[in-house]
């Protein structure tokens, strides 16, 4: 679906910077994105996970308000038309959307925010937040991706086939990401993810937004656009 409420911000990378950072983790189904994200969040209480709205039916053990805000197509479209979503997309026949107000409130308060998102959504977010960091998680091979999809036992064989067919076109968009992590060894992939978060927090724009008074006292000012 196309989000008609996307509002593009100025291209100055320092304009309107919030104290909090915005991370987007993108991956095809079965690449291990959610497992890596959960491990990252467990060891870093400064990151808030954005909970998306979706029209997808809940999977076993998924809770409304914890894993997703599960809603109807009618309610989703009303929210979309009202401009409530920072980004929205249709994936495998279901709609997903991210709350704009919640994201901005968290970042203004100094919290980092992480979005588990698809490549379409990442493109929409980057039009509005040019400092957003996209991290693409790749599997070590297509064979490994298929095996992981089968092992998790969440989808019927026809759904797995559809996800594998979609994975090729999805992974082609890894070229649009700032960083790529290949999830062959979980511990190594998690370490790389943690390093990318730490490096992002040390960027000039991020440090200036968090410590503006210190920078001004030291005579350090924002570069011109």
Curated annotation (Swiss-Prot):
Q: Name one GO molecular function term.
A: guanylate kinase activity
Recorded GO cellular component terms are: cytosol
Q: Which SMART domains match?
A: GuKc (SM00072)
Q: Which catalysed reactions does the entry list for this protein?
A: GMP + ATP = GDP + ADP
Report keywords, A-Z: ATP-binding, Cytoplasm, Kinase, Nucleotide-binding, Transferase
PROSITE patterns according to UniProt: GUANYLATE_KINASE_1, GUANYLATE_KINASE_2
Cite the EC number: 2.7.4.8
Cellular localization per UniProt: Cytoplasm
- Name the Pfam families on file: Guanylate_kin (PF00625)
- Please name the SUPFAM superfamilies in this protein's record: P-loop containing nucleoside triphosphate hydrolases
| Domain Guanylate kinase-like intervals | 20-198
The UniProt function text for this chain reads: Essential for recycling GMP and indirectly, cGMP.
Stated name of the protein: Guanylate kinase
Naturally occurring in which organism (per UniProt) = Paraburkholderia xenovorans (strain LB400)
């Amino acid at each position: 679906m196309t989000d008609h409420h996307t509002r593009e911000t100025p291209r100055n990378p320092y304009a309107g910077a919030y104290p909090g950072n915005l991370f987007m983790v993108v991956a095809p189904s079965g690449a291990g994105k959610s497992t890596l994200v959960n491990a990252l969040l467990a060891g870093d209480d400064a990151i808030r996970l954005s909970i998306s709205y979706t029209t997808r039916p809940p999977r076993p053990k998924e809770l409304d308000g914890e894993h997703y805000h599960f809603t109807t197509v009618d309610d989703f479209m009303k929210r979309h038309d009202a401009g409530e979503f920072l980004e929205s997309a249709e994936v495998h026949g279901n709609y997903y959307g991210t709350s704009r107000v919640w994201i901005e409130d968290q970042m203004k308060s100094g919290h980092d925010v992480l979005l588990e998102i698809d490549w379409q959504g990442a493109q929409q977010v980057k039009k509005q937040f040019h400092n957003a960091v996209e991290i693409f998680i790749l599997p070590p091979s297509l064979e490994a991706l298929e095996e992981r999809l089968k092992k998790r036992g969440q989808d019927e064989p026809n759904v797995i086939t559809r996800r594998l067919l979609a994975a090729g076109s999805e992974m082609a968009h890894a070229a649009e990401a700032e960083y790529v992590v290949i999830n062959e060894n979980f511990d190594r992939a998690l370490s790389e993810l943690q390093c990318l978060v730490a490096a992002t927090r040390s960027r000039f724009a991020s440090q200036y937004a968090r410590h503006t008074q210190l920078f001004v006292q030291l005579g350090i000012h924002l570069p011109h656009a």
